[in-house]
A protein has these predicted regions:
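Intrinsic N-terminal pre-sequences and regulatory tails
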Residues: 11, 21, 62, 68, ...
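Aromatic (Trp/Tyr) and acidic
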Residues: 59-72, 76, 324
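Short, solvent-exposed micro-motifs at the edges of structured domains
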Residues: 3, 81-82, 87-449
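Signature of Gram-negative outer-membrane beta-barrel scaffolds
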Residues: 1-16, 222-225
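Secondary-structure transition/capping motifs at alpha-helix termini
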Residues: 13-18, 196-199
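Short, surface-exposed helix-loop/turn micro-motifs enriched in polar/charged residues
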Residues: 17-20, 387-389
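Surface-exposed extracellular loop regions of Gram-negative outer-membrane beta-barrel proteins
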Residues: 18-61, 141-147, 284-288
Length: 449
């Protein structure tokens, strides 16, 4: 693999005692493992026992390939640096795979890297208050991307053509595996306000506006790629769009407040009984407000006979938001969208055979998250001869206001009358699940001694 150069640099400057300016840049790597490289595609990676046509099978428990694709009977021109052990059952040229779908694992795969940079300005006010503004960005390269090397080139297929004749390697069907040319980009503006704990109160709030784009996410196991939606396997740029993780707006905050009653506080501080009853109580809460994540609208009609997804065409002049909202919004409305019909399927048209739809990956956004959590508690001192015994009681309410945060709708379209016709409303556009559970209240008590 060789050495990996991962430089990192940072700087900080304080032009005044109450102002700090910081910045930094670094390159980080996702180290490869056997799971990422070989186990990524279990049917043909390292350790796989692959069988070819006829009486040819692996005799090495997946240590060496059954056949080399740069051998006789193929137009492949790749080289194989691994030692090659011929199976004992037959001399198997690559032609043993003719007419079949074949998997691949790349050699000399570069390590995925992530460049990150940031610039921030921090200002303190009256010792106990702090405001910070920051820009944070990143760029990922050499990311894993599941693809088909033998996809039919766009615009080559015409009426009455034989599809397999236009494949780059027509001796085979799909050539599926993972490439390493995926990229990602992230840019964000972040603002935060913090009050240190004084006079029984502290709080912090931060807001992030961000945009993340990529052509493949990494939500799979380890560093593997996650769920994929592409319709042009040999055109990675066509898949570059909003990331599955893109959350444009995010607000989070917390607060802690000690009630001003009892000993040492402003009120009811001279009565021992009142101090035990109302003194020392502490309340806290957190707020989470997130805008929705994107999803992809697909059609069940495979208009190009590929092994990816088929996207519809956009219907010009027709709103993506449901048109008959009054009849379908009985269970909730969010910014013009309805739980019973989150998007308008008539805004999309069935593409013609042999064409790709013009709707991009992750072009629509689902519901966001709204959650408030509240807690309260107090520590009681109990009489003890030696070490003090303390009783802590608390109550926690998760999603205290029982606000529903709905899941994503099903983006699969069906029911179009024909090519160029809009899709009909079906049950799949409804949202039937949630991402956050309902209100849960928990009481607890703990004795320490």
């Amino acid at each position: 693999m060789g050495n990996i150069w991962l430089p990192r640099v940072g700087a900080s400057w304080a032009p005044r005692p109450d102002i700090t300016v910081r910045g930094g840049f670094g390159i980080y790597a996702y180290a490869w493992s056997l799971d990422n490289y070989g186990g990524n595609n279990t049917s043909y990676g390292m350790g796989a026992a692959k069988s070819a046509s006829g009486n040819v099978s692996d005799q090495t428990n997946g240590i060496t390939p059954i056949t080399k694709l740069d051998g006789p009977g193929t137009i492949f021109g790749t080289s194989n640096p691994l030692p090659y052990v011929q199976p004992s059952t037959s001399a198997a040229p690559a032609a043993a795979y003719n007419g079949q779908a074949v998997g691949f694992v790349l050699y000399h795969v570069p390590v995925p890297k992530m460049m990150q940079w940031n610039f921030a300005v921090q200002k303190a006010f009256h010792t106990n208050y702090m405001v910070e503004m920051a820009y944070i960005g990143s760029h990922g390269s050499n990311l894993i991307f599941a693809t088909d090397l033998n996809a039919i080139p766009a615009n080559d297929l015409g009426p009455n053509d034989v599809a397999d004749g236009y494949r780059p390697y027509p001796l085979f069907q799909n050539l599926t595996g993972s490439s390493n040319n995926g990229i990602s980009n992230y840019n964000s503006l972040q603002a935060s306000f913090t009050k240190r704990f004084t006079r029984g109160f502290s709080m912090s709030a931060n807001y992030v506006w961000s945009h993340m784009l990529d052509d493949q996410d990494s939500s799979g196991w380890g560093n593997r790629e996650g769920p994929q939606s592409w319709q042009i396997a040999n055109d990675l740029a066509a898949n570059y769009s909003n990331s599955n993780f893109d959350v444009r707006n995010a607000f989070k905050g917390y607060a802690v407040y000690t009630l001003p009653f009892g000993r040492g506080q402003a009120f009811l501080n001279h009565n021992a009984l009142l101090d035990e009853l109302v003194g020392g109580w502490q309340l806290s809460g957190t707020v989470i407000e997130l805008s929705g994540q994107p999803y992809t609208v697909t059609t069940g009609q495979n208009t190009y006979q590929q092994d990816g997804s088929s996207f519809p065409n956009r219907n010009p002049g027709v709103s993506v938001k449901p048109t008959n909202r009054s009849a379908r919004c009985a269970q909730g409305s969010f910014s013009g969208h309805c739980v019973n019909e989150w998007y308008n399927p008539a805004a999309f048209l069935e593409p013609a055979n042999g064409t790709f739809g013009n709707v991009r990956r992750n072009s629509l956004y689902g519901p966001g998250i709204n959650q408030v959590n509240l807690s309260g508690g107090k520590v009681f001192a109990m009489p003890g001869e030696n070490d003090p015994v303390k009783l802590q009681i608390r109550i926690d309410a998760t999603n205290a206001f029982n606000h529903a945060s709905f899941g994503q709708p099903n983006g699969s379209l069906s029911g179009a009358a024909g090519v160029g016709q809009p899709y009909a409303p079906i049950q799949q556009q409804q949202i039937t699940g949630t991402t956050v559970g309902g209100r849960a209240v928990q009481f607890g008590a703990k004795i320490t001694f």
